[in-house]
Regions:
Chain A
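Hydrophobic alpha-helical segments embedded in the membrane of multi-pass proteins
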Residues: 48-57, 73-77, 108, 173-174, ...
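Transmembrane helix-bundle core of multi-pass membrane transporters
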Residues: 117, 121-185, 212-215, 234-243, ...
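Single transmembrane alpha-helix segments in multi-pass membrane proteins
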Residues: 25-88, 112-119, 254, 258-268, ...
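Transmembrane alpha-helical segments in multi-pass inner-membrane proteins
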Residues: 218, 224, 234-300
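Short loop segments and helix-boundary regions at transmembrane helix junctions
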Residues: 2-10, 67, 87, 104-147, ...
Length: 341, 528
């Protein structure tokens, strides 16, 4: 890494999140003897999967100046669709495909509402958040579906590689890699950054901004549906409120990872580090037996912290640059003597 | 509503202006109102200013000249408290001052018109004029909207601008936005007024109005620092001229002691011809064909033919609909009627247009031209990303090579191609936009104000480039408010007024008078 690149990283949001992660690991290790344990780490990974998967789509959505608040409800609706089908002896593969299609359609609806009518995605997805949850309620009411096929509910453990790494872990790792490559190494990702950073420039350069956005909303819904499958197989049950409140965690992860809510900035790497951070914090709270309400408050606090941190880091970087400049000037290395007139 | 403060009417403003203290005049004997001594500024690895001196006296118009990236805007930002100098000091009325913030400079009655308008797009014109100082009435004080609009209207009238004070700024053209900023600076009744390239987007008539206002202010004792690249304007306006080159002070003398050649030599360090002479070629096969293009309420019945090797100028006043036609041709704006064909192929979307070989260099470089936060190389590669990439995967090495190649051809002044255009001077940002579109190697090129804010040397470079491209068979539509530029380069000149093409002139018959006559309403033309 060149010194300029090193400096850029040192004053980046990602670096800040890495530091927070280290601090969190140290603190939780001190607090609980059960934390530093391979089995616990495997558990953290399992518990973070669904959030992480959805965050992989939320990151580029934030980069492109949009947001999807309906992901928790989409997950719930998809889970209910799957539960209904699977418990009524529909072949597993067909049920899985129908579930994924449900998520994709939900995302498509969001995307079309946002782009066709030029509506703000906060408003649209706040609406569909209620709509999708309502649909889930209409389908199953307040019953809990537990009659899921064994081959599915056990997939977590049965196909485990060794005792620690499960199939969902591997799938997530692959998805994260694919997302990182797509966002940071492909032409699609490049267009996403332009569409988020300068939408008019993107349009003038032939980028189909609306199409990109619809695609990202579809990805968001699809990943939420896949997360629904993971969650269902993990919890072995489905209810209408499955996945509620998940959007808060996903957003916390994405913003804590350095994505700028004003668009144009964000990395999959940052999101993954923040995912680990939130996983560790949640594990610490579980080990410490914190009540549920307190956990939500902690997550909310993290979200606020991440937003403030963005501003503070920006200010720090500017100050550091100024100090470097002054030093160089005082040294006079690059300046010529005052011209005499 | 209990008590209503008397609105600050134009009459009242006149009174207040009279309170400007008497000053010795323009003989130079007085203490400078604002002075910079040995001021330096470094950004990262770039020395923007290197021990520069400047002194502004009351009642003079002082021109600051230099090539793109010479440090003019940086100096103005230091004078108005946006940047702090790394070395040197500022003095107001001979006393050393330290501007920590723009507010501190404003307290010393220093007002600035920035190079790129910085307004609140969602607010109305009047609010932008009086931002932070809106007239209040009632208790608790509320903004007196009526007085504010009336006063804004008066200020705008003083500038010769017919603008609705209640209009939303986001709906204004660049030139109109600039007038709003100007009105804001006027309303502060500053002792020092800094104007950074105010005329780049204005038509000759608007420039005349602006100069009248600036001279009026000078005669009332205001010190004016004026930045521009059009030499004829500088000679028409300036009392003194200070020249910067590569961040260094070159000289400062009375305008009368300079002529065009000496000024260019001071800026560039060598001799440059002021206008490039066109090498005309016989136009080849027809390329772009526009028939009956219309957009309700904006323009109508526009026909255009561009042949290979031909340059067609599109002249007219700001607001005549030239940019709107270009946007519709490229497919960015909806069309209500008409067709666009390139070599027989129908074009509807920007994607189709780009694929067929059409390129469009837009007028507003910061909003439509470059993404100022993303690297130069990524910007240059964007329109041909598919070609630069390998099956959808980025090849950063090729992007950088592409950007370097075009950067060199246009003499782009940047640290490296990974730099963000936000850190570049205005003229160099314009070069990035040009590089980006020339790199697509188009068959038809639409240029909307391609040399706005570009320095003399680079302007000649760009003119030569346009000429070369045409000679090599490219068809070019040149939209420009710089009439000499249009006349020197075009084979044919189309003139637009209020959304219609009012004249089509062969270059031999295109004189400034005929163009201006077609561009303005007949009634005015007769009166003139
Ligand atoms: N914020 C910044 N960060 C880094 N470099 C900067 C910054 N602002 C200006 N520079 C550099 O300082 C130099 C002087 O820029 P400046 O904007 O003052 O030029 P200018 O004389 O106003 O040019 P123009 O005629 O094109 O407007 C340029 O090389 C520019 O790239
Ligand atoms: Mg400038």
């Amino acid at each position: 890494m060149s010194s300029r690149a090193a400096r850029r990283f040192a004053f980046s949001h990602e670096a800040f999140t890495v530091v927070l992660l280290v601090v969190a690991v140290v603190v939780v290790t001190q607090l609980s003897p059960y934390f530093l344990d391979a089995q616990n780490f495997s558990q953290i990974a399992t518990d973070s999967l669904e959030i992480g998967l959805i965050a992989l789509a939320m990151t580029p959505l934030i980069v492109v100046r949009e947001i999807d608040l309906s992901v928790g409800s989409t997950l719930g609706l998809a889970a209910v669709v799957f539960g209904e089908l699977a418990s009524h002896d529909v072949p597993l593969l067909a049920a899985v495909l129908a579930t994924v299609a449900t998520g994709a359609l939900a995302g498509l609806l969001n995307g079309l509402l946002v782009t066709r009518f030029g509506l703000s995605s906060i408003v649209v997805t706040l609406g569909t958040m209620a709509l999708f949850r309502g649909l889930a309620n209409a389908i199953v009411g307040d019953q809990t579906i537990t009659t899921l096929p064994d081959s599915f509910t056990a997939s977590d453990t049965r196909y485990a590689i060794g005792t620690l790494v499960t199939i969902p872990h591997v799938l997530f790792a692959l998805a994260a890699l694919a997302a990182a490559l797509l966002l940071h190494r492909s032409t699609v990702g490049r267009r996403i950054f332009f569409a988020g950073s300068s939408p008019d420039v993107a349009t003038h350069s032939g980028v189909r901004v609306d199409r990109l956005k619809v695609g990202l909303f579809v990805a968001s819904g699809t990943l939420a549906a896949i997360a629904a499958l993971f969650m269902t197989s993990r919890l072995q049950s489905v209810r209408a409120d499955t996945g509620s409140g998940l959007e808060l965690l996903v957003l916390t992860v994405v913003l804590l990872g350095g994505a700028d809510i004003r668009g144009g900035r964000g990395t999959i790497f940052g999101t993954l580090v923040a995912l680990a951070l939130v996983g560790v914090v949640r594990s610490g709270m579980a080990l410490g037996d914190l009540p549920d309400q307190a956990r939500v408050a902690v997550v909310g606090g993290l979200l606020l912290l991440s937003i403030c941190a963005g501003v503070a880091i920006e200010a720090l970087r500017r100050r550091a640059a100024e100090r470097r400049t002054t030093r160089r000037i005082r040294g006079g290395a690059e300046l010529r003597p005052t011209p005499t007139t | 509503m209990k008590r209503r403060e008397a609105p600050r009417t134009p009459e009242r403003r006149e009174e207040e202006k009279d309170h400007v203290p008497e000053i010795e005049g323009r003989d130079g004997a007085a203490v400078p109102v604002l002075e910079a001594r040995a001021v330096s500024k470094v950004f990262g690895g770039t020395v923007a200013l290197d021990h520069v001196d400047l002194s502004l006296r009351a009642g003079e118009i002082h021109a600051l000249l230099g090539e793109n990236g010479a440090g003019k805007s940086t100096l103005t930002r230091i004078l108005c408290g946006v940047h702090r100098p790394d070395t040197g000091e500022l003095r107001v009325d001979g006393a050393v001052v330290d501007f920590h913030t723009p507010a501190a400079a404003q307290e010393h009655d220093i007002a600035i018109l920035h190079q790129e308008p910085s307004l609140f797009g969602d607010l109305e014109v009047a609010e932008n004029v009086f931002v932070g100082r809106q007239p209040k009435h009632g208790r608790p004080p509320r903004i007196d909207r009526r007085a504010m609009r009336a006063e804004a209207a008066a200020l705008l009238a003083e500038l010769g601008a017919e603008l609705d004070p209640a209009a939303r700024v986001a709906d204004l053209s660049l030139a109109e936005a600039q007038l709003v900023e100007m009105a804001g600076a006027l309303s502060r009744r500053a002792r020092v007024l800094i104007v950074d390239e105010p005329t780049a987007a204005l038509t000759p008539g608007e420039v005349g109005d602006l100069f009248r206002v600036l001279r009026g202010l000078r005669d009332r004792g205001v010190a004016i620092l004026f930045i521009g690249h059009r030499l004829e304007e500088i000679f028409a306006l300036a009392d003194r001229i200070t020249v910067l080159r590569d961040g260094r002070f070159v000289d400062s003398r009375a305008a009368a002691d300079h002529d065009e050649a000496s000024l260019i030599r001071a800026m560039v360090g060598r001799d440059v011809a002021a206008l490039h002479v066109r090498t005309r070629v016989e136009p080849g096969e027809p390329l772009l064909q526009v028939r009956g293009l219309a957009r309700a309420g904006v323009f109508e019945a526009v026909d255009l033919d561009l042949r290979s090797g031909e340059i067609v100028g599109l002249a007219g006043l700001v607001g005549a609909g030239r940019t709107e036609v270009a946007r519709a041709v490229f497919g960015i704006d909806r069309r209500d009627a008409g067709t666009v064909e390139l070599a027989g192929e129908r074009l509807r979307t920007p994607q189709q247009a780009m694929r067929a070989g059409l390129a469009f260099v837009p007028e507003d470089r910061q909003r439509e031209g470059v993404a100022v936060e993303l690297p130069i190389a990524a910007n240059v590669a964007l329109p041909i990303l598919g070609r630069v990439a390998f099956h959808g995967w980025l090849r950063p090495g090729r992007e950088r090579a592409l950007a370097r190649e075009w950067g060199e051809r246009l003499r782009l002044k940047a640290r490296d191609v990974e730099q963000a255009p936000r850190e570049l001077s205005g003229g160099n940002q314009q070069k990035v936009v040009l590089a980006k579109w020339l790199a697509t190697r188009p068959r038809v090129l639409i240029l909307d104000e391609p040399t706005r804010g570009v320095d003399v040397g680079a302007k000649v470079e760009i003119h030569r480039l346009i000429d070369e491209l045409a000679a090599a068979g490219m068809a070019i539509l040149l939209i420009s408010s710089d009439l000499p530029e249009v006349l020197a380069l075009s084979d044919r000149v189309l003139v637009m007024r209020e959304g219609r093409v009012t004249a089509a002139l062969h270059h031999a018959e295109a004189t400034p008078e005929r163009v201006m006559q077609a561009a303005t309403a007949e009634a005015q033309a007769v009166a003139a």
